[in-house]
Amino acid sequence: MNKLYIGNLNESVTPADLEKVFAEHKISYSGQFLVKSGYAFVDCPDEHWAMKAIETFSGKVELQGKRLEIEHSVPKKQRSRKIQIRNIPPQLRWEVLDSLLAQYGTVENCEQVNTESETAVVNVTYSNREQTRQAIMKLNGHQLENHALKVSYIPDEQITQGPENGRRGGFGSRGQPRQGSPVAAGAPAKQQPVDIPLRLLVPTQYVGAIIGKEGATIRNITKQTQSKIDVHRKENAGAAEKAISVHSTPEGCSSACKMILEIMHKEAKDTKTADEVPLKILAHNNFVGRLIGKEGRNLKKVEQDTETKITISSLQDLTLYNPERTITVKGAIENCCRAEQEIMKKVREAYENDVAAMSLQSHLIPGLNLAAVGLFPASSSAVPPPPSSVTGAAPYSSFMQAPEQEMVQVFIPAQAVGAIIGKKGQHIKQLSRFASASIKIAPPETPDSKVRMVVITGPPEAQFKAQGRIYGKLKEENFFGPKEEVKLETHIRVPASAAGRVIGKGGKTVNELQNLTAAEVVVPRDQTPDENDQVIVKIIGHFYASQMAQRKIRDILAQVKQQHQKGQSNLAQARRK
């Protein structure tokens, strides 16, 4: 994506004119300007320079009385499903952007592009060409919090790539293993190692001291701690604080953290700029609830054990640019470093649990994109492939080639109904479109009911998206406290004849389910089956726990169904004999 289209040029513009304006704004380019009648093309050395040229010139710089319009040059055959949206307000919430994008079709992927501009940029992939065309037509120039969005195509490489060289490692266009590929055949899938970096927030005035003269100090830190350290100096220009990412083992991260903290304390003392320099750790919002613990118990224990004072930034600070919470630790250097070890231990545990749930979801729901759903850090590099086998799980292809419709009942606080519905029903409509599911809120059972039932009908991926957004909305709207994890009760219906299989002999299966998923799973005894001869299974837990339990129960039901069909087939064959 390094080739640029330069539009809105006067007929008299020459290559020399363009060379001059690029030089004046210090924008690098490679090769020659190819000037046509009213437009031109040029190559940039890399994607960074291409984005910088677009941000610098497009609609801002005049040449011979006309404002330049610059965007990625995309051949017609590659104008398919991918677009880039620029000039997004930096404080915009993901929820708002996702709702806007979902109005024009199914978003398969949405990822943020790192730029030096104050506004945000995202690359979006829709499910088909027509949806993309509608999005460009409606969103280009759309006003969002006093920012006019700029939308253009970016190359969709899959359109021109063949099946052999266009995709990675035996996977189809949406992530499914192709028939005959090693993963599809059940070969061992190699798990990537967990790499969740330690992210620190440091005052900008200390960044120079951390890097050192010609990078000597930071090289010394990386060498001693066997780590890779990225100082994000160019992001959020003018900000009072900068992020530093440390990639290493937990021990290496902690050693690097201590060295960086010591440098900041020394610099503060030498320059007399601060009496105290707290340790600030960045953690994705998805993990913070489990770090805090029920009623804040986990966090209180860390404070007591390490003799530190720990505070966490508000949920209200989360924006499109910033899905992370800031954990501020105050105390002596040694104590702060001990607190870092405990905090990151909790964060890594939460991450590993989510990766396990994510692996199961990607195994059972091919094509599921958790970053696009907005439930898993898009920055996480360690996204494992689907597991080659999951205990008790039948291969997806064997029983769900056409995903079956599932009906799930989720119980939410009664006072949250308005937030889920939204003004004039807008939010629930957008949620339904986004998830491709039917979402209805049942009337209250009694006038003073404290909970309301949300009925979601759709295939597994739709269930995942819809339920995830409901959990997220309840947290965002503060229906659960800042130190409280969102745990909801969910009901799924199973055939009465299969309830015993869910429970297992002596409750063995249901106990294993609870241990595996961390959700509470209850099959109420003495239930009267409904008109469809089904009974209720109750699941209580946070989002990933609930999802994992739901999928495992569906596995059990699928196996029961398979065995029943096999038995019927054998019986029919015996009769024919």
Swiss-Prot record:
PTM info: Phosphorylated at Ser-181 by mTORC2 cotranslationally, promoting binding to the 3'-UTR of IGF2 mRNA.
Mutant phenotype after disruption: Mutant mice exhibit high perinatal mortality and only 50% are alive 3 days after birth. Early death may be due to intestinal dysfunction. Animals are on average 40% smaller than wild-type and heterozygous sex-matched littermates. Growth retardation, probably due to hypoplasia, appears from 17.5 dpc and remains permanent into adult life. Mutant animals exhibit other stricking features, including impaired development of the intestine, with small and misshapen villi and twisted colon crypts, abnormal kidney architecture and loss of cartilage in the lower extremities.
Provide this UniProt record's keywords sorted from A to Z: Cell projection, Cytoplasm, mRNA transport, Nucleus, Phosphoprotein, Repeat, RNA-binding, Synapse, Translation regulation, Transport
Q: Which GO terms describe its molecular function?
A: mRNA 3'-UTR binding; mRNA 5'-UTR binding; mRNA binding; N6-methyladenosine-containing RNA reader activity; translation regulator activity
Q: Tell me the Gene Ontology biological-process terms attached to this UniProt entry.
A: CRD-mediated mRNA stabilization; dendrite arborization; mRNA transport; negative regulation of nuclear-transcribed mRNA catabolic process, deadenylation-dependent decay; negative regulation of translation; neuronal stem cell population maintenance; pallium cell proliferation in forebrain; positive regulation of cytoplasmic translation
List every stretch annotated Disordered.
156-190
InterPro entries the UniProt entry points to: IGF2BP1_RRM1 (IPR034837), IGF2BP1_RRM2 (IPR034842), KH_dom (IPR004087), KH_dom_type_1 (IPR004088), KH_dom_type_1_sf (IPR036612), Nucleotide-bd_a/b_plait_sf (IPR012677), RBD_domain_sf (IPR035979), RRM_dom (IPR000504)
Q: Which residues form the RRM domain?
A: 2-75, 81-156
The UniProt comment on domains reads: Domains KH3 and KH4 are the major RNA-binding modules, although KH1 and KH2 may also contribute. KH1 and KH2, and possibly KH3 and KH4, promote the formation of higher ordered protein-RNA complexes, which may be essential for IGF2BP1 cytoplasmic retention. KH domains are required for RNA-dependent homo- and heterooligomerization and for localization to stress granules. KH3 and KH4 mediate association with the cytoskeleton. Two nuclear export signals (NES) have been identified in KH2 and KH4 domains, respectively. Only KH2 NES is XPO1-dependent.
**Family to which the UniProt record says this protein belongs:** Belongs to the RRM IMP/VICKZ family.
Instruction: Spell out the protein name for this chain.
Output: Insulin-like growth factor 2 mRNA-binding protein 1
Annotated source species:
Mus musculus (Mouse)
Gene assigned in the entry? Igf2bp1
